[in-house]
Structure formats: structure tokens, C-alpha cells
Curated annotation (Swiss-Prot):
GO terms for cellular component: lysosomal membrane; membrane; monoatomic ion channel complex; plasma membrane; postsynapse; transmembrane transporter complex. Glycans are attached at residues 78, 113, 187, 213. GO terms for molecular function: ATP binding; ATP-gated ion channel activity; CTP binding; extracellularly ATP-gated monoatomic cation channel activity; identical protein binding; ligand-gated monoatomic ion channel activity; purine nucleotide binding; purinergic nucleotide receptor activity. This is P2X purinoceptor 4a. The chain crosses the membrane at residues 37-57, 344-364. Its main location: membrane. It comes from Danio rerio (Zebrafish). Functional P2XRs are organized as homomeric and heteromeric trimers. Forms homotrimer. It is found in: Cell membrane; Lysosome membrane. Signal peptide: none annotated. It comes from the Eukaryota.
């Protein structure tokens, strides 16, 4: 019963006690120096990091962006399959337009004059045979070259494989040409047009800056030293800035990233808001894991012979895909974040006294004396009762 009463008294004291501040001036160089040093750190943090570096007085918005590209350049090839041939933008840009990216054909394996007919399958552990019984009629291997006819035929003088119904002659399993067929692609150029918007601030801009005119665009090529504002880029320079070799990358293909960053302080003149370009390779280039390297796909060009037979030229194309990625953030003065950060700074300054009190009452030699001076307990009615006497 007594424990219950004691517990109730403790709860009552906690609920009805009133705490008020008491100013205690401690004349100590150590404590004073610690107090001012801690205050200086808080002020430096609020002014230096929050206000100056992080621009805590600004409201921010993220960028909205659209990107279009236009590639130009001519390449000449001379192969046994196609002979001497000129390649222009309609030949090597596949597809003509993509969302925020473009693909440039740099190398290929060409198989000409394919028709729907029967031929021996390419030799693999699953396709080699010794008799017709090894070749199931109608079998369709997803990784094979066609539908089997049920016959085992000669692929070469020493190898037999199952006959398939497919586009014949089949594509040969060979490595891509080295050096690449379209080695001249290194000198192709691309015009990147980027329009950005910060809707919160109703701010619009594009990477073709106001100081750029049509005559300048006809001859400029991006260079960090001489033409940092030019939106026309040489493909070899893009790959080179990523510390890659274009001719090596063009053999098997790959993926490059063109990064455009718009970080704009809208409290400053609009002419200061300009794009910053960086380039990097995005696909994995690991010498210890070079299985299925690069970037490639197949496409075909169809036509009919004079006798009406449908024929196609199959191209296994290797190339470089360029992904254009836009990042950015804009800031502009706003009273609300300014007041919020000022309030947070004042709250941090209030913590300085708490820290100094804790150090004084915990680590100082005269901590007990300071504690007696710091806290005074006054009972209600007790003082009035003593005064009446």
C-alpha cells in the first residue's frame, strides 16, 4: 500500500512541478572558450554549409527535358559480299529515331542471297549426326537455324549435320571483322538538341544558346577548350573523352552515355545557366568476363529476283548506342525555406548551452558546487509559512 502511495506522489510531483530558467554565470576560461567555440562551429555550419554551399535560402525544382538527335557522315566500304559501297545516314542509323538515344552501325557480318530453301545446319553438338535417325522431322530448336526435315546431310567433307528448312545459305558463325568495316564512323558528327524546363519557376532554355547562330553551327564541333557551347559532337571525341578507343569499341559495339547536366541558380543572370557535358561508357567491359561482349542485332533487306523468288540480305550489325541522359536542378530565393533554415540554426545554437551545461556538471572538478548553484528547489507555501514566523 505504501509503495502505491509513493508512486502516486512521484507522479503527482512530476505533473505539478514547474520548471523555470535560472541564469548562472560561470567565470571560467575553459567553459567560456568551449561555449564560444561551439557557437562558432554552429554559425559556420549554418552560414557556410546550409546557406552558401547548400543554398538553403532557395526553393528547388528538378528538370524536365526532351532530346532530339541528328547524325551526319559518309563511310566507304569494299567487301566481297557487297563490293564497293557508300554508306550514308539512312544506312547506318537504325532505327531513324529513338527516344533519347541513337544507334550507329560500325561493323557487320553480311550473308547475301538468302532464300527459303533446305540446307545443312551449322555444326553444333546438337545438330551433328551420323544417320537420318539422329534428325527428328519437324523438330524446331529455338537455338537452331530452322525446322528439321529428318535428313542427315553433309555439311563438309568430314562433318554431317541435320538438314533444315530455313533461309539458306545460313549465316556463318564467325567473329566480326577487325578492323571494323565502318571505321570512318569515328568522324561522324551528331547534333544534340536539348530543351529543358523548370515548371515551378516557369523557366525554359535549350542547349543551342542565344549566342549561337546558323553560320556558327555549320562549322563548329564541340571542344572543351575552343567550343564548349557547340551542340555538335564528333563520335570519336565522345568515346575518347570516356577514355575508350573508338576503333576497338566499334568491332563488337557497345553503349555510351552522353550526360547533360543543368544546374541553374536562377537568382543569377540566365546566361549563367548553361549545360555541362560529360561522357562515359555504360555497358560492362570486364576483361575477366568477356562473354557476349558489345552490342549487336540482326536485320534484313528483302527483294525479289527476276524469277519472282523472295530473296534477302541478312546483316548482323554491330554498333554503338549513344544514350543521352539529362540531369539538373534549379534554385531560386524563397522566404519559406529561408525562415525554416534560420529557425533550424537558432535551434542548434540553443543546443550549445545544453552541451556546455552537461560538460560542466559532468566533467568539471567543481561540478557538485555548480550543480547546487544551478538547481534550486522551492516548496509551495513553505516560504510563506517561514516568513509568517
Amino acid at each position: 500500500m505504501s509503495e502505491s502511495v509513493g508512486c502516486c506522489d512521484s507522479v503527482s510531483q512530476c505533473f505539478f512541478d514547474y520548471y523555470t530558467s535560472k541564469i548562472l554565470i560561470i567565470r571560467s576560461k575553459k567553459v567560456g572558450t568551449l561555449n564560444r567555440f561551439t557557437q562558432a562551429l554552429v554559425i559556420a555550419y549554418v552560414i557556410g554549409y546550409v546557406c552558401v554551399y547548400n543554398k538553403g535560402y532557395q526553393d528547388t525544382d528538378t528538370v524536365l527535358s526532351s532530346v532530339t538527335t541528328k547524325v551526319k557522315g559518309i563511310a566507304l566500304t569494299n567487301t566481297s559480299e557487297l563490293g564497293e559501297r557508300i554508306w550514308d545516314v539512312a544506312d547506318y542509323i537504325i532505327p531513324p529515331q529513338e527516344d533519347g538515344s541513337f544507334f550507329v552501325l560500325t561493323n557487320m557480318i553480311i550473308t547475301t542471297n538468302q532464300t527459303q530453301s533446305k540446307c545443312a545446319e551449322n555444326p553444333t553438338p546438337a545438330s551433328t549426326c551420323t544417320s537420318h535417325r539422329d534428325c527428328k522431322r519437324g523438330f524446331n530448336d529455338a537455338r537452331g537455324d530452322g525446322v528439321r526435315t529428318g535428313r542427315c546431310v553433309s555439311y563438309s567433307a568430314s562433318v554431317k549435320t541435320c538438314e533444315v528448312l530455313s533461309w539458306c545459305p545460313l549465316e556463318k558463325i564467325v567473329d566480326p571483322p577487325n578492323p571494323p568495316l565502318l571505321a570512318d564512323a569515328e568522324n561522324f558528327t551528331v547534333l544534340i538538341k536539348n530543351n529543358i524546363r523548370y515548371p515551378k519557376f516557369n523557366f525554359n532554355k535549350r542547349n543551342i544558346l542565344p549566342n549561337i547562330n546558323s553560320s556558327y553551327l555549320t562549322h563548329c564541333v564541340f571542344s572543351r577548350k575552343t567550343d564548349p557551347d557547340c551542340p555538335i559532337f564528333r563520335l570519336g571525341d565522345i568515346v575518347g573523352e570516356a577514355e575508350e578507343d573508338f576503333q576497338i569499341m566499334a568491332v563488337h559495339g557497345g553503349v555510351m552515355g552522353v550526360q547533360i547536366r543543368w544546374d541553374c541558380d536562377l537568382d543569377m543572370p540566365q546566361s549563367w545557366c548553361v549545360p555541362r557535358y560529360t561522357f562515359r561508357r555504360l555497358d560492362n567491359k570486364d576483361p575477366d568476363n568477356n562473354v557476349a561482349p558489345g552490342y549487336n542485332f540482326r536485320f534484313a533487306k528483302y527483294y525479289k529476283n527476276s524469277d519472282g523468288t523472295e530473296t534477302r540480305t541478312l546483316i548482323k550489325g554491330y554498333g554503338i548506342r549513344f544514350d543521352v541522359m539529362v540531369f539538373g536542378q534549379a534554385g531560386k530565393f524563397n522566404i519559406i525555406p529561408t525562415l525554416l533554415n534560420m529557425g533550424a540554426g537558432l535551434a542548434l545554437l540553443g543546443l550549445v548551452n545544453v552541451i556546455c551545461d552537461w560538460i560542466v556538471l559532468t566533467f568539471m572538478k567543481r561540478k557538485q558546487h555548480y550543480k547546487e548553484q544551478k538547481y534550486t528547489y522551492v516548496d509551495d507555501f513553505g516560504l510563506l509559512h517561514n516568513e509568517d514566523k
